[in-house]
Every structure is written in structure tokens, then in C-alpha cells.
Regions:
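C-terminal auxiliary extensions adjacent to catalytic cores
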Residues: 183-210
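Short aromatic-enriched loop/helix-cap "lid" or pocket-rim segments at secondary-structure transitions
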Residues: 11, 50, 158-160, 170
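Conserved mid-domain beta->alpha element of the FAD-binding
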Residues: 26, 57-60, 80-168
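Solvent-exposed, flexible loop/coil residues
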Residues: 21-22, 33, 45, 55, ...
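Residue-level signal for pocket-adjacent positions within structured domains
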Residues: 1-4, 46, 81, 87-90, ...
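A basic- and aromatic-enriched beta-loop-alpha substructure that forms the phosphate/nucleotide-
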Residues: 160, 175, 209
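C-terminal domain-closing interface element
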Residues: 168-189
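Conserved FAD-binding catalytic core of PHBH/FMO-like flavoproteins
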Residues: 1-79
Length: 210
């Protein structure tokens, strides 16, 4: 939503509220001109996978009744919402076959709890382009296999990490002291995740094809 609707909302940080079975996230985008917000709530309703299914702002507000007044302030300004279901899938055992290869969500659909779906797709694209630049029609299957070997385990770790992070965001998760310690320790995993440079590894994989 436009920041002008909630002018006192901070634009220098993201904020998350954790509760039993649900959590709420809000953060600035477009240099603070907009505030993006997401409410995660459980449901038994079967939903189609869609990014454009309309939601009901009042239903969203009711899902967080009794929570922090800042959430009520934000949701009080909501006029339009969208909703989508989160489906968890196990990492695929195979990404490629002969001259056919998968990347991005087709290869590794993941939960959003690390914010890594698009990032990992970009890494895929860089790795694939770097390796295929050294390939020809005859060596394409080997190049695709090299791409899969380079990327599959790293992305599987991210998929599993997103799942585990989502569980931590539920206050019913184990002992809260243990949960909070895990969230703090998770900074090390995030640094390793964010600092990764796929280019040198992809170049080495490409050179090995020669």
C-alpha cells in the first residue's frame, strides 16, 4: 500500500510478528514509497495455485484481532488484498534429461520463508548460461548435467531451510527459548546464503567440460 496511508510507518526496516499458527510481515519497497505486507494464516480450504486470487480485507483483519495495534493500523488502511496457498514440495531428484533441463520454480518450488525463490532462479540462470556458453549441440546433455550437479544440492538446502524457517515462525514450535536461539543462529546460514557467488563455480564446471 502507499506509504502515505500510514505515514508514520518506518521505512528503514522490515518487521515480523510471530504467533500461534500464524505470523505477519511488513516491509518497505520502492525506496519506501510502498509498504508490502503479508499475513500467513492456516486454512483447511483447498485453493488453486494463483498469484492473483482476490482476498477479503476484512477476513485478513479478523485473522489478526488482538495482535499488535500497529498491525491493526496497517490493516485498517487495506482496501484490496490477494491470497495464495503455500504448498510445500520435496526437492526433485532429477532436473535434466538429455537436452531438456529445468530451472527456477520448475526445478525447485519453495516456500517464501527465506525470500529466495527469485534469487535462486537468477543463480540458476547465471549458472546455466555460463556452462552452456562452453557447450555445443553434441555436449549439451553433459553441460545440462553439470549444471544440475552444480545447483541441485545447494537449492535443496535452501528449500529445506525455507521450510524449517516457516516452522520457527509458529510460536507453537517446540520450546520458544530454543526457537529464538535458532532464529538468532540462523544469521550464519543467511550470510552464507547471501554471500554465495555462483559465477566462479559455474566457470569451473564449464571448464571441466572442455
Amino acid at each position: 500500500m502507499p506509504h502515505e496511508r500510514v505515514p508514520d510507518w518506518p521505512t528503514d526496516r522490515w518487521q515480523m510478528w510471530l504467533g500461534k499458527g500464524r505470523h505477519f510481515l511488513a516491509f518497505p519497497v520502492r525506496a519506501g514509497k510502498l509498504i508490502n505486507y503479508v499475513g500467513f494464516v492456516p486454512t483447511d480450504e483447498e485453493m488453486k495455485e494463483s498469484w492473483t486470487a482476490p482476498g477479503n480485507p476484512e477476513v485478513l483483519r479478523q485473522a489478526f484481532v488482538g495482535w499488535d495495534p500497529r498491525i491493526h493500523q496497517l490493516l485498517g488502511e487495506v482496501q484490496v488484498t490477494f491470497r495464495w496457498a503455500l504448498y510445500d514440495r520435496e526437492p526433485l531428484p532429477v532436473w535434466t534429461k538429455q537436452r531438456l533441463g529445468l530451472l527456477g520454480d520448475a526445478a525447485h518450488p519453495m516456500l517464501p520463508h527465506l525470500g529466495q525463490g527469485a534469487n535462486q532462479s537468477i543463480e540458476d540462470g547465471i549458472a546455466l548460461a555460463t556452462i552452456l556458453a562452453r557447450a555445443n549441440r553434441a555436449t549439451a546433455p553433459s553441460a545440462l548435467l553439470a549444471y544440475e550437479r552444480l545447483r541441485r544440492e545447494r537449492v535443496a538446502q535452501v528449500q529445506r531451510g525455507a521450510r524449517e524457517n516457516g516452522l520457527r515462525y509458529d510460536s507453537a514450535y517446540s520450546d520458544l527459548g530454543v526457537r529464538d536461539a535458532e532464529i538468532t543462529a540462523h544469521a550464519t546460514f543467511r550470510k552464507r546464503l547471501y554471500d554465495h557467488d555462483v559465477v566462479p563455480d559455474a566457470q569451473a564446471a564449464a571448464a571441466a567440460l572442455m
